[in-house]
């Protein structure tokens, strides 16, 4: 997709409509793990101040094949998307390789690793279940910290039968019956 800019982010428009503070914590290409980490850290750093009485989080889940890693030499977190290794051209993969190895290893080794991971290690059903457990734990953590939230599938529907147990936003209605994701709803 194409970035429309931070001024047209749906959550910013919602904050303006509700006349409330807006804090943008999302990053294009982020993993679910990164989103949960950012939410957790924000709550731990802001909930004690009393500035926010009952923050509302709008969470758009990404694909389960994305995962967060901490760069040893940069001392910061990045996300890897091995399911899309075929979409990385050499230049893009070089940028990832710099984050991962600081150019100490060949970019082709990274490509082989990502292909190996997707072919032999990644199991979509298992990762969907892992995401569902994480969402349920996030649900209880947010409730326990007086936070409200709404969650939806941005890219793929991995939530299975937990949707009725959480504050889930569905895009399906009488007219739209496709995959219950923001991406597919927008393309409909």
What kind of feature is each model-predicted range?
Residues 1-40, 49:
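Serine-esterase "nucleophile elbow" of acetyl-processing enzymes
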Residues 40-188:
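Alpha-helical cap/lid subdomain in secreted, periplasmic
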């Amino acid at each position: 997709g194409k970035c429309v800019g931070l001024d047209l982010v749906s959550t910013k428009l919602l904050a303006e409509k509700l006349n409330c503070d807006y804090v943008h914590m999302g990053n294009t290409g982020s993993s679910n793990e990164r989103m949960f980490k950012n939410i957790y850290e924000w709550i731990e750093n802001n909930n004690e101040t009393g500035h926010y009485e009952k923050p509302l989080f709008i969470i758009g889940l990404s694909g389960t094949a994305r995962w967060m890693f901490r760069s040893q030499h940069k001392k910061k977190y990045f996300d890897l998307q091995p399911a899309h290794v075929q979409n990385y051209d050499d230049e893009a993969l070089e940028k990832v390789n710099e984050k991962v190895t600081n150019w100490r290893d060949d970019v082709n080794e990274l490509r082989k690793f990502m292909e190996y991971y997707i072919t032999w290690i990644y199991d979509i059903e298992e990762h969907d279940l892992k995401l569902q457990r994480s969402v349920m734990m996030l649900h209880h953590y947010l409730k326990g910290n007086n936070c409200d939230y709404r969650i939806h599938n941005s890219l793929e529907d991995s939530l299975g039968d937990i949707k009725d147990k959480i504050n889930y936003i569905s895009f399906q209605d009488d007219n739209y019956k496709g995959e219950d994701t923001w991406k597919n709803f927008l393309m409909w």
